[in-house]
UniProtKB/Swiss-Prot annotation:
InterPro entries in the cross-refs: 6-PGluconate_DH-like_C_sf (IPR008927), 6PGD_dom2 (IPR013328), NAD(P)-bd_dom_sf (IPR036291), Opine/Lysopine_DH (IPR051729), Opine_DH (IPR003421)
Family per similarity comment: Belongs to the lysopine/nopaline/octopine/opine/vitopine dehydrogenases family.
GO MF, one example: oxidoreductase activity
E.C. number(s) listed in UniProt: 1.5.1.-
Keywords for this protein: Crown gall tumor, Oxidoreductase, Plasmid
Class of this enzyme: oxidoreductase
UniProt keyword Oxidoreductase, yes or no: yes
UniProt key word Oxidoreductase: yes
Record protein name field: Vitopine synthase
Length: 360
């Protein structure tokens, strides 16, 4: 029996563990660990014990295997999954630095310049066989009490590895998912193919007045607020694609990704958000201090803009979102966000930046 370690105990981690338990039965053991600084979900699940996976194609009870000790969690694991937001990835990597990871593969699910962060933090001699990054998570999902809902299973999603994997290793990795995997040529393409910074910030900024005025219940995020901001969403997506073209990377439009992942009959992006059932019950954040701004803007879009400037691409829509988000958070995100300088790439040219995003 093979083993995977899942670092994080949020919606994705628990859904992934339940999926492995129900779909792969006794073939794979999934062990969950969470940082000691953020164990609310971890401890709550421990108190519940057995959870119920509720999915579109299969469901059933499973008992997550929780491990308090990081060393024990990753011991003999062929694959180690980071299932935490960008903000938490670096902290976990700094805890992993004390261990020899040279016989494992590290996966950021999803990735966010994780290959670059690994290179900056992990010792070369103890680094993983490869780092794999994905554009998105395999599912739209959330846990409510003891029920873990797979709201939508993506038909496929995109991944890239920093090193060439053997056929056997690739097959074992792909078998962990119910989805088809599309392999991109490099992790840099994955970083710029994350559509969260395109969709989330415009939606929550449109919702600002309703959130701050305490409206209850709030309209649903994808049903109401994202469609209301669709012009800005589209502007951001167009700028994202311009950066990709300038850097010679690969990607697709945000709407193409939505259709590829979830299917449906929508003919344009606004219609997709208004009609896709997997998003129907996704609520709107009740505070503006939310990862839609603190992660998607501060830690991803700011870096996109800095790279765009080096590549000679004009991104006025992104800059306006960053400024507006900064006003909401009372920060100058161009100063406090994740920057080229903070990633040891100050003064780098586009070729060096792409190389670094690929973990080199």
């Amino acid at each position: 029996m093979s083993k995977v370690a899942i670092l994080g105990a949020g919606n994705l981690a628990l859904t992934f563990a339940g999926d492995i338990a129900r779909r792969l039965n006794e073939e794979v053991t999934a062990v969950i660990w969470a940082p000691t600084t953020n164990r609310r979900n971890f401890n709550e699940v421990r108190g519940i014990g057995t959870l119920e996976l509720v999915g579109p194609d299969y469901e059933g009870a499973f008992t997550p295997q929780l491990e308090d000790d990081l060393e024990a969690a990753i011991l003999d694991a062929e694959f180690i999954f980071l299932t935490v937001p960008t903000l938490a990835q670096e902290g976990i990597l700094r805890e992993l630095v004390k261990f020899d990871l040279s016989e494992t593969v590290l996966i950021a699910l999803p990735g966010s310049a994780t290959s670059l962060t690994c290179k900056n933090i992990l010792f070369p001699s103890h680094s993983p066989v490869a780092v794999i990054e994905s554009t998105t998570s395999p599912y739209a999902c959330r846990r409510i009490g003891e029920r873990v809902h797979m709201l939508g299973v993506k038909a496929c999603f995109e991944v890239a590895a920093t090193s060439l994997l053997s056929n056997d290793l690739t097959s074992r990795f792909e078998a962990l998912f119910p989805n088809r995997l599309q392999w991109y040529k490099d992790a840099a393409s994955i970083f710029f193919s994350n559509t969260n910074p395109v969709v989330h910030p415009p939606g929550i900024l449109v919702a600002k007045d309703a959130i701050e005025n305490g409206m209850s219940p709030l309209p649903k995020f994808y049903r109401e607020f994202v469609p209301a901001a669709i012009e800005r969403v589209q502007e951001l997506d167009n700028e994202r694609l311009e950066i990709i073209a300038a850097l010679g990377l690969e990607s697709e439009t945000g709407f193409t990704y939505s259709k590829k992942w979830y299917g449906g009959q929508a003919t344009e992006w606004k219609e997709f958000f208004e009609t896709y059932e997997g998003y129907a019950e996704v609520g709107t954040p009740t505070t503006m201090h939310h990862r839609y701004l603190t992660e998607d803007v501060k830690h991803i879009m700011v870096l996109w803009v800095q790279i765009a400037e080096v590549a000679g691409v004009q991104v006025p829509a992104m800059k306006s979102v960053i400024k507006e988000a900064g006003n909401v958070l009372y920060e100058d995100l161009f100063m406090t966000g994740r920057t080229l300088a903070s990633m040891n790439l100050g003064g780098a040219n586009p070729y060096r930046i792409v190389d670094a995003l690929n973990g080199n």
